[in-house]
Design a protein with these regions (language model features):
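A transmembrane-helix-recognition feature enriched in membrane-embedded lipid enzymes
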Residues: 31, 182-212
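A structural signal for short, hydrophobic/glycine-enriched beta-strand patches
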Residues: 29-189
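N-terminal membrane-anchoring alpha-helices
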Residues: 1-47, 209, 213
Length: 213
């Protein structure tokens, strides 16, 4: 009977510790999302600005995507970066990729074609940055500035760090989420905090499996 009690005691302690660790990680992820979303007083310099993909409406960038592109153009025009990298594939064949839509938008704003790089195969943030790393190596770019919506930055920076990409960040100063209702803002904050939490869990799992194997 004592053995059974001890087993249950250790099991409950293990469960309690696991829940504590999971809760702590969730709180830490929420803090990271909040911290990285805050406006930056200084604009970072780098070899290139990377615009993470977002929805394209036909051959036009969605409002969210357009704000990301415009912020990258501002950094380029002010001399903070010398190259622009646009990322993103397409959900359906026969449509322009997100990267192509962004490139065409930038060309219409007078950006020289030789200063634009694109990758057109990615479907998510992780693939955006994996393919960006390849472009950096191919074109001898040392560092980048990641551009996305404020609440998306924390996850993008975590991925960049895991991929050994030397990166800074610059959240878009304007976004549809800034003018959204508090319910919409809260929902997006929770969504991004959860996405970052899941990413760290999966990354930890992959790291453990490599050690075991």
């Amino acid at each position: 009977m004592n053995i059974q009690r001890k087993k249950r005691h250790y099991w409950l302690r293990g469960l309690g510790l696991s829940l504590l660790l999971i809760g702590s990680l969730q709180l830490w992820c929420a803090w990271q999302v909040y911290r990285f979303s805050q406006p930056k007083n200084d604009l970072p310099q780098a070899d290139a600005a990377v615009v993470l993909g977002a929805a394209a409406w036909g051959n036009r960038p969605s409002p969210v995507f357009r704000e990301r592109i415009n912020h990258a153009l501002t950094l380029y025009q002010m001399g903070y970066v010398r190259k622009l990298i646009f990322t993103g594939g397409t959900p359906k064949s026969g449509y322009e990729t997100e990267a192509e839509v962004a490139r065409n938008f930038a060309l219409k704003q007078g950006i020289p074609e030789q200063d634009i790089l694109i990758e057109m195969r990615s479907k998510n943030t992780y693939q955006n940055l994996v393919n960006t790393r390849f472009l950096m190596q191919k074109h001898h770019l040392r560092d980048i500035v990641i551009i996305s919506d404020p609440l998306h930055i924390a996850r993008a920076m975590a991925i960049a760090e895991d991929l050994d990409i030397k990166a800074n960040y610059s959240p878009t100063p304007t976004s549809r989420y800034h003018n959204a209702s508090w319910q919409t803002q809260a929902a997006f904050f929770i969504q991004e905090s959860y996405a970052l939490f899941i990413y760290h869990l999966l990354h930890f799992g992959r790291s453990i499996s490599k050690i075991i194997i």
